[in-house]
């Protein structure tokens, strides 16, 4: 993995992917997945309208210059084409030693291993660059694909919280159960 850090942006690459800072031109590409009901069915947000996506991108631009920075949410792009296919975030906790991993991939690219590849890179980034002791992740209990990603990453299953999140699913809200995973830097 190649980590490249400059004053303007943070980038790291995996074998097939480039993770970069979001920019103002990313609204349409983000809307392609964030505005899709199937793509966001297991998320605790969405589907988002265009204004919500614009606000999301603007918030990510603002976070790029915050000090100290606690949110590292990157655009996941196919290295060969530059096409933005999702997002991968590392959200640092207040203690500076623990973080949460989160991700979304455009459904047109599901089943190709991109989420696992980007998440593996983000875990390394969190442990190596930010010296995190523990990185956790969670997913809707019905999201078997995300569950498999966390298992492939070697994350340890820590339990399932029953009816723990009240989320918007399609046009209505409902209680959903959540699976929790974590990985220690020493693992």
Regions found by a protein language model. Give the residues of each.
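Acyl-donor (CoA/ACP) binding surface of acyl/acetyltransferases
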Residues: 1-38, 58, 75-187
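Short loop/turn motifs at secondary-structure junctions and domain boundaries
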Residues: 64-69
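Conserved GNAT-fold acetyl-CoA-binding loop/helix
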Residues: 38-61, 74
């Amino acid at each position: 993995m190649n980590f490249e850090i400059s004053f303007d942006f943070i980038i790291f690459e995996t074998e097939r992917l480039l993770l970069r800072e979001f920019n103002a031109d990313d609204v349409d590409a983000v809307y392609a997945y964030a505005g899709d009901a199937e793509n966001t069915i297991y998320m605790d947000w969405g589907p988002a309208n265009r204004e919500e996506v614009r606000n999301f991108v603007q918030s990510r631009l603002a976070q790029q210059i915050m000090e100290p920075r606690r949110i590292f949410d990157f655009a996941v792009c196919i290295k060969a084409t530059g096409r933005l296919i999702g997002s991968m975030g590392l959200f640092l906790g207040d203690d500076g030693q623990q973080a949460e991993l989160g991700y979304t991939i455009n459904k047109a690219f599901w089943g190709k291993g991109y989420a696992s590849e980007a998440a593996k890179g983000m875990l390394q980034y969190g442990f190596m660059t930010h010296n995190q002791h523990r990185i956790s992740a969670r997913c809707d209990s019905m999201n078997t694909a995300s569950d498999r990603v966390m298992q492939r990453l070697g994350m340890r299953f820590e339990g399932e919280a029953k009816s723990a999140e009240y989320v918007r699913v399609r046009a209505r809200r409902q209680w959903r159960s959540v699976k929790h995973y974590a990985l220690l830097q020493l693992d």
